[in-house]
């Protein structure tokens, strides 16, 4: 530990506040809060920690702290600091999961809408609904039952909805404020849980229509009742008080936290939200940070009541969110909290089980591959592939797999420099020479296995450079494809002998992933270079276009096709003088063969 850190730790105050952990560049990498700064900050540098926390602590070279007057103030400040610095070790809930609401607009002639964006306007919002289908089914029923206007813009004449008795036609008729209010009140009653009452009213109307021999009307009312029954069946009542509430539960294991939220609306459990993230604080502190961010997210509407587990300070939550927060000791709410806790625990167990299974499969695949090839377990595998089209823009690519997983920071791209024309073998010689000469000079980690995407000639070329020129003896195998360009088998040794793997084995799947990945990486790099060269060669003969302007045009348009479709104004917008823009436009439109 740095000496200045020890000195700062020694003078930490025993007061609430926030702390900001910094790395060697001075970047804030983590923001936390504490009831007692002295105890919390010191805990990072003492005792044992899980792997994730050890990585965080390993990067800390300095910290700052801000003393606050209360835990509530610390919670508010923490959220603001996280938004300001966006530290890489803090959770940041993404605003990408939104739920649909039904909205009654505040227009003079109100409408029913489905929206995922709750605004602070005069409209009335109902929800959230678990999914778009549920919201649309409810709106469709309401549209049939209550004749609010349907059109976004008022038409000049009545539409089909009027003839279906689903609109009062305010476009051509006078619909009073009182009429609209009566309809809106009925809709609100329905959306606030008055399904049974509305159903009873419809039943009475259905029998009346039947007695009057209005069988078509009676059938329509019967269908509406059936739709209400279907909606009620999907939203079983779990609480009788009809209060909108969010019920929270959480679990912590192996440095991860899972928080589950049950959305209860009008007494019905309609949806659940699951969030999982690494945690570096005490569980209670991590939960408070989560719940603060959860309701800052515009897609999460604050209900009338928030229900939290017994370990959480409900008074602090209530003051912070300005919503009633309860900590139930018994009854249905306590049962729901325990159910949320249980679901969170199960979700974490499932996550770790799947991770362990995946790791077990990949490690076994690597181990079995080594045994099949008669070598030590190849924990680090490097694979090479060449790419060119008729010798133009020849490139090569190298990828690395460590413990059976792609290590993308280790990937490398190579422009072929010494080879003229389409010579795959010489290209392979060059790239193997460049890769491992540098590895020796810079003392970089060497692979346990090298895979060359190719046959005997490619393998011989690479082996010649590696062993005869560089004096390296690393196991090397050629990856041979079938006539459909799919993974077939490996060849290894001198002379090369085929090693056939079971096609349904994990080691064969590993080879397929390696082959697909190195090919993808090489071909993507080649296309980038080829696209640039095509554009640049197409621009070579245009007066006034030098290398600098070629780069500007390439960056702005990205492809020759887009340049050929561009107007003079768009070339000017890209930074070309008007006379040059006109020249480019004329040249590219005349050159039909480009």
UniProtKB/Swiss-Prot annotation:
One of its GO terms (molecular function) is excinuclease ABC activity. SUPFAM superfamilies: C-terminal UvrC-binding domain of UvrB (SSF46600), GIY-YIG endonuclease (SSF82771), RuvA domain 2-like (SSF47781). It comes from the Bacteria. PROSITE patterns: GIY_YIG, UVR, UVRC. The keyword Cytoplasm applies. It is found in: Cytoplasm. It holds the Pfam family UvrC_RNaseH. One of its GO terms (biological process) is nucleotide-excision repair. Residues 196-231 form the UVR domain. One of its GO terms (cellular component) is excinuclease repair complex. Keywords: Cytoplasm, DNA damage, DNA excision, DNA repair, Excision nuclease, SOS response. The keyword RNA-binding does not apply. Residues 14-91 form the GIY-YIG domain. NCBIfam families: PRK00558.1-5, uvrC. Belongs to the UvrC family. Interacts with UvrB in an incision complex. The UvrABC repair system catalyzes the recognition and processing of DNA lesions. UvrC both incises the 5' and 3' sides of the lesion. The N-terminal half is responsible for the 3' incision and the C-terminal half is responsible for the 5' incision. This is UvrABC system protein C. It comes from Bacillus cereus (strain G9842).
């Amino acid at each position: 530990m740095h000496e200045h850190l020890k000195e700062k730790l020694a003078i930490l105050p025993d007061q609430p506040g926030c702390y900001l952990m910094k790395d060697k560049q001075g970047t804030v990498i983590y923001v936390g809060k504490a009831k007692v700064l002295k105890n919390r900050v010191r805990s990072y540098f003492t005792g044992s920690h899980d792997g994730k926390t050890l990585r965080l602590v390993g990067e800390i070279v300095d910290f700052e702290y801000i003393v606050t007057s209360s835990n509530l103030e610390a919670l508010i400040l923490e959220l603001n600091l996280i938004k300001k610095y966006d530290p890489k070790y803090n959770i940041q809930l993404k605003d990408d999961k939104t739920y649909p609401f039904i909205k009654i607009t505040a227009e003079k002639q109100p409408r029913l809408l489905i929206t995922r964006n709750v605004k602070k306007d005069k409209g009335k919002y109902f929800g959230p609904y678990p999914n778009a289908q549920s919201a649309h089914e409810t709106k469709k029923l309401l549209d049939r039952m209550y004749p609010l206007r349907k059109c976004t813009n008022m038409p000049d004449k009545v539409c089909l909805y009027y003839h279906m008795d689903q609109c009062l036609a305010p476009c051509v008729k006078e619909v009073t404020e009182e009429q609209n209010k009566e309809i809106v009140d009925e809709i609100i009653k329905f959306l606030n849980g008055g399904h049974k009452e509305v159903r009873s009213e419809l039943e009475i109307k259905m029998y009346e229509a039947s007695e009057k021999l209005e069988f078509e009307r009676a059938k329509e009312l019967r269908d509406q009742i059936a739709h209400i029954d279907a909606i009620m069946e999907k939203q079983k009542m779990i609480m009788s008080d009809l209060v909108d509430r969010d019920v929270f539960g959480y679990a912590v294991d192996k440095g991860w936290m899972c928080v589950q939220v049950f959305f209860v609306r009008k007494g019905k459990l309609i949806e659940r939200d699951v969030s999982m993230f690494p945690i570096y604080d005490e569980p209670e502190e991590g939960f408070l940070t989560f719940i603060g961010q959860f309701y800052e997210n515009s897609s999460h509407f604050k209900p009338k009541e928030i229900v939290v587990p017994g370990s959480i300070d409900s008074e602090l939550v209530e003051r912070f969110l300005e919503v009633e927060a309860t900590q139930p000791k018994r009854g249905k709410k306590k049962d729901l909290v325990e159910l949320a806790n249980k679901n969170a625990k199960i979700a974490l167990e499932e996550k770790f089980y799947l991770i362990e299974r995946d790791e077990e499969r990949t490690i076994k695949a690597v181990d079995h591959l080594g045994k099949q090839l008669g070598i030590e377990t190849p924990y680090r595998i490097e694979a090479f592939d060449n790419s060119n089209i008729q010798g133009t823009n020849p490139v090569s690519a190298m990828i690395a797999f460590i413990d059976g997983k792609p290590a993308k920071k280790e990937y490398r791209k190579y422009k072929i420099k010494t080879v003229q024309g389409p010579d795959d073998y010489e290209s392979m010689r060059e790239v193997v020479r460049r890769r491992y000469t540098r590895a020796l000079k810079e003392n970089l980690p060497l692979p346990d296995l090298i895979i060359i995407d190719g046959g005997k000639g490619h393998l011989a070329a690479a082996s010649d450079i590696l062993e005869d020129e560089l004096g390296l003896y690393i196991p090397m195998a050629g990856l041979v494809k079938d006539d459909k360009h799919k993974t077939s088998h490996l060849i290894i040794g001198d002379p090369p002998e085929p090693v056939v793997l079971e096609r349904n084995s994990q080691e064969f799947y590993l080879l397929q992933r390696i082959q697909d990945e190195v090919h993808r990486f090489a071909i993507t790099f080649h296309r980038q270079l080829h696209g640039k060269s095509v554009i640049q060669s197409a621009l070579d003969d245009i007066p006034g276009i030098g290398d600098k302007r070629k780069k500007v045009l390439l960056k702005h348009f990205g492809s020759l096709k887009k340049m050929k479709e561009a107007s003079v104004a768009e070339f000017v917008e890209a930074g070309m003088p008007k006379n040059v823009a006109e020249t480019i436009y004329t040249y590219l439109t005349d050159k039909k063969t480009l």
